[in-house]
Amino acid sequence: MGLSTLEQKLTEIISAPVEALGYELVGIEFIRGRQSTLRIYIDSDDGITVDACADVSHQVSAVLDVEDPITVAYNLEVSSPGLDRPMFTAEHYTRYLGEEVTLVLRMAMQNRRKWQGIIKAVDGEMITVTVDGKDEVFALSNIQKANLVPHF
């Protein structure tokens, strides 16, 4: 997924303290607004607890206070990816081949920005998703948001 320059910088700053605590940094989102939000998604083989989120929040806050990459006031949120897990990297798509995904594109393809289908293949920075029986190819850089579709 095409991250903004700020999101790339934040990922570089945040990854070390998250990994030092034994967690995987799944991805981040920085949502600008009247009250901006920095959302950090973490995971581990044992799952994520509220205490894990608090530990990561404390460590990341300390690092961000020193580095100070965000010039506006913001809320920091740390959470597990959840059932509708966000997808940020080619590795995420590879890990979930055969699963259903919802995509929101930065620039429309075939007059559509929202797509839903089954992840069929990953080739470098391109993913193939089967939508209504037809294979569609998307550049990761054109994907604004992607989430797994949970099935119960």
Swiss-Prot record:
Instruction: Give the domain of life.
Output: Bacteria
- Which GO BP terms sit in this record? ribosomal small subunit assembly; translation
Q: Per its UniProt record, what InterPro entries does this chain match?
A: Ribosome_maturation_RimP, RimP_C, RimP_C_sf, RimP_N, RimP_N_sf
This protein's GO cellular component annotations are:
cytosol
Q: Localized where?
A: Cytoplasm
* Keyword annotations: Cytoplasm, Ribosome biogenesis
Q: Name one Pfam family in it.
A: DUF150_C
Tell me the first and last residues of the signal peptide.
none
HAMAP family found in the cross-reference section: RimP
Q: Name the NCBIfam families for this protein.
A: PRK00092.1-1
Protein function: Required for maturation of 30S ribosomal subunits.
What protein family is recorded? Belongs to the RimP family.
Give the protein's recorded name: Ribosome maturation factor RimP
**Source organism of the structure:** Yersinia pestis
